[in-house]
Amino acid sequence: MADSLDHAPAQANNLPQFLALTIGSIGVVYGDIGTSPLYAFREALRPFGPGGVGRDEVIGLVSLVLWTLTAIVTIKYVLFLLRADNDGEGGTLSLLALLLKKGTKYPVLMFFAGVLGAALFIGDAMITPALSVLSAVEGLKLVAPALHDYVLPISVVIILLLFAVQSRGTGAVSVFFGPITLVWFLVMAAAGVAHIGDDLAILSAFNPLNAIGFLWNAGLIGFIVLGAIFLTVTGAEALYADLGHFGRHSIQAAWFAVVFPALALNYLGQGALVLSHPDAISNPFFLMFPNWALLPMVILATAGTIIASQSVITGAFSLIRQAIHLGFLPRFEICYTSETQTGQIYLPLVNTILLTGVLALMLMFGSSEALAPAYGVSITGAMVIDTILAFEFVRRQWGWPALTAIAVLLPLFSLELIFLGANLFKIHHGGYVPILIAGTLIMMMWTWRKGVSLLREKTARQDVPLDQFIATVERKSEHAPVEVPGTAIFLTATPDTTPAVLLHNIKHNHVLHQHNVIMTIKTAKVPYVPEKDRYTITKLSDRFSLLELRFGFMDDQNVSRALVRCRKEGFRFEIMSTSFYLGRRKLIADPRSGLPQWQDKLFIAMADSAIDPTEYFHLPANRVVELGEQVII
């Protein structure tokens, strides 16, 4: 597996590489937003009912779609937020890590904002596969109405297969994601062009006054429709989250050259079709195609939705890994499915949770029409969070005056709040789902942070300063522990205090190794730490050294590999004659200790679900010694 230098944020050094990154970004970054035409315009028309939508309403709706894509995706994400990176990496937690590193006047507010944004993204990762796959497979009802009852079972089978192959990695098939999605966008654009001629009046949708006029005249229905309009930009947050994988210029080029034109043409074509054939309101996307093309389009749409689903699943894995490394969640098992790309990971527990959530949503709602209202809340919430974090970023990182930041971001923030309000109208129609998912994840992250903090406070009362301990054991005395040959490495989170496992080893075994290394592992608030900055070794005495290993929150925290690097550069020890001492705590709940009983039990359950440090840090299992203790929390 390559080191972190091989996984720096993507940059194109020549034209072929730039084109490869651009096509790749079309598949991974834009897969989600590319499937929105399947259902977004249909859902926007739904409040008017069959035959209840007039020409002005159709043109106004398409105008709203075009200008929402322009304001939210083009201006906010493609032109602005892609520049707000943390050493080339984007995403909510990456931006939060940068703000916490730089310092902010509102650390608690920023923490909760970042965690809420991440939690909403996990909700999105459950809803996107369910909604997009259902939307694609529902096209079968137009091919053969008798297949109506088979839509849900077929969709469930596709989802089961999709999650079943996650453990094998997607490296082998991901090379096809970009080309397949490129074909999808080109077909959508061609379909749009073919139908714009049905009624050229649709071209007046480019005039933003039509969007404003629609909202002014439609009243409450217009406000409710905004929730469906926002479905056209679902997946825009992936632009920012995938910044490190493809680079800003490739993502921007893909948007302006392919994605935006294809989406605009397709929505214009759907609008023209509805103007000329009002009965097409039931499913304007698939009704753009002749009967002979319906089955191929269902197959292509299904492939596109699988790619979109894969993108958010991969994004969820990456986000949870960031949360683990930043200390927001316990250490879950992380499997690397590629020998060359640390970004290709698989988290078994997270995969199971996502699969369970997706299947539950599909079985609970049964159709894309019923599930669509649940989608907008998570996306609008995540985008509002991005804007809040971006406001603090431009002030701290770019040095913008407060008035300048307000002038630039307030219009976007206000627009997103309006969309959020429109989506909140759908809470009783399924909008509660992402709120419940986000609330559960926030509760877990907050409980973990509080529990870890309380645990540190309790153990700190028994801590022995490391310098004091070394002075004591180095002193010649008849009670001094027996020295044994070899090297012992003791893992600790607090390098200035004596590891509890070291104290227990002396207390119970009465021995001290010839060489003792106090090792601490730090996660920097940057995505990757260069190998030259990976470690620092400090000699404390003849028998004691302090080793600090540093990893970025996107790095594979492979301690064995880092130690090999240390050995090459002068840190002398034999890995197979070295013992790694780890402490294992048995947590006992006590409602009087600082946490409510329910939170105590949740924290202990989360701690018990964490992967063994031996596996997580890639330590040689046959060289690990564990000593346990009970802690009341």
UniProtKB/Swiss-Prot annotation:
Predominant place of localization: membrane
InterPro entries hit by this protein: K+_transporter, K_trans_C, K_trans_N, Kup
Gene Ontology MF: a single term: potassium ion transmembrane transporter activity
Catalysis performed (reactions): K(+)(in) + H(+)(in) = K(+)(out) + H(+)(out)
Organism domain of life: Bacteria
Family membership: Belongs to the HAK/KUP transporter (TC 2.A.72) family.
Descriptive protein name: Probable potassium transport system protein Kup 3
Organism: Sinorhizobium medicae (strain WSM419)
Lineage: Bacteria, Pseudomonadati, Pseudomonadota, Alphaproteobacteria, Hyphomicrobiales
Gene: kup3
